[in-house]
């Protein structure tokens, strides 16, 4: 209407959408709110006063990095989740915004592709489901999603544990962490990964391989992200250490006397700090 601007900001500690008055540059009201993170605005439907966007962390109790797609009114009411299944979603909308093709998976869940209604997210028709039976027949094991508290004893850190295909719980395994903790992003895989050269190959050599996103990475709260502000040497390492110790306490086959770390680029800096 040329009177308002939709603005994205972390002003309340989480990345959200706000309605601003164009003439005064003052906020009119907050559109989205809660302890979650708006990732991308996909379309602003001015005729129907609706915003289509992606976000992570909306659903309580699940991995806060998993992306889903939503629709909400300009007034902040009637939030609708268009991709209700748990998973990391990637969607493409039709030109008229009536439908979306949604592909979703997790590290331990094979990809599924469906056609959905953009009105309510209901599945119009299934399109494809990946068949991983041959992969499983070869002995493939999915990574484990593991969660533990970080340095503050209260914030969940999310990571992966990758074991060799011939894993024996009665053995002791050296542990190696693949680290990349550069600011401005999040790095632990969230989609289906049948093979990951920097983790799977090492696991097949007889290691337990781990990866975790510590404080200082993106898509959580501003407070979480700002741990690395003017403090790159922190590298989230106190959170990584707490997470690995928690994993070692749960799984005695992880040899806490033989723990290594490696990475490249920012990960190279962090592994040699």
PLM regions with names:
Residues 16-18, 68-70, 112-114:
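A short loop-to-beta-strand structural motif that recurs across blades of beta-propeller domains
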Residues 10-15, 60-65, 106-109:
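Short, solvent-exposed loop/turn segments at conserved positions within beta-propeller repeat blades
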Residues 7, 53-65, 185:
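Short, conserved, GDST-rich strand-edge loop motifs in beta-rich repeat architectures
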Residues 81-83, 88-273:
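Serine-hydrolase catalytic core recognition
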Residues 1, 9-10, 20-47, 56-61, ...:
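Multi-bladed beta-propeller domains
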Residues 15, 26, 77, 111, ...:
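Glycine-centered loop/turn positions within well-structured domains
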Residues 2, 48, 96-100:
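Conserved loop/turn motif of beta-propeller repeat scaffolds
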Residues 5-8, 51-55, 100-103:
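Residue position within the beta-strands of beta-propeller blades
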């Amino acid at each position: 209407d040329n009177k308002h601007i939709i603005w994205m900001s972390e002003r309340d500690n989480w990345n959200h959408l706000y309605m601003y008055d164009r003439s005064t540059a003052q906020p009119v009201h907050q559109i989205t709110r809660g302890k979650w993170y708006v990732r991308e605005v996909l379309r602003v439907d001015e005729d129907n006063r609706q915003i289509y966007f992606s976000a992570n962390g909306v659903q309580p109790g699940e991995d806060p990095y998993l992306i889903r797609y939503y629709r909400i009114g300009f007034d902040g009411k009637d939030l609708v989740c268009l991709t209700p299944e748990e998973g990391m979603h990637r969607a493409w909308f039709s030109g008229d915004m009536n439908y979306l093709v949604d592909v979703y998976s997790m590290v331990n869940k094979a990809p599924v592709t469906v056609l959905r209604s953009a009105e309510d997210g209901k599945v119009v028709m299934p399109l494809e489901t990946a068949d991983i039976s041959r992969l499983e027949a070869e002995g493939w094991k999915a990574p484990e999603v593991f969660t533990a508290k970080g340095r503050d004893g209260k914030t969940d850190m999310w990571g992966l544990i990758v074991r060799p295909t011939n894993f024996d719980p009665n053995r002791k395994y050296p542990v190696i962490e693949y680290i990349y903790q550069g600011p401005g992003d999040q790095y632990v895989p969230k989609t289906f990964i049948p093979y990951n050269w920097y983790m799977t190959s090492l696991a097949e050599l007889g290691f337990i391989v781990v990866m975790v996103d510590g404080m200082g990475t993106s898509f959580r709260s501003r407070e979480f992200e700002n741990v690395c502000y003017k403090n790159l040497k922190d590298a989230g390492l106190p959170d990584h250490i707490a997470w690995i110790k928690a994993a070692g306490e749960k799984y005695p086959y992880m040899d806490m006397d033989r723990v290594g770390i490696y990475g490249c680029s920012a990960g190279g800096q962090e592994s040699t700090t």
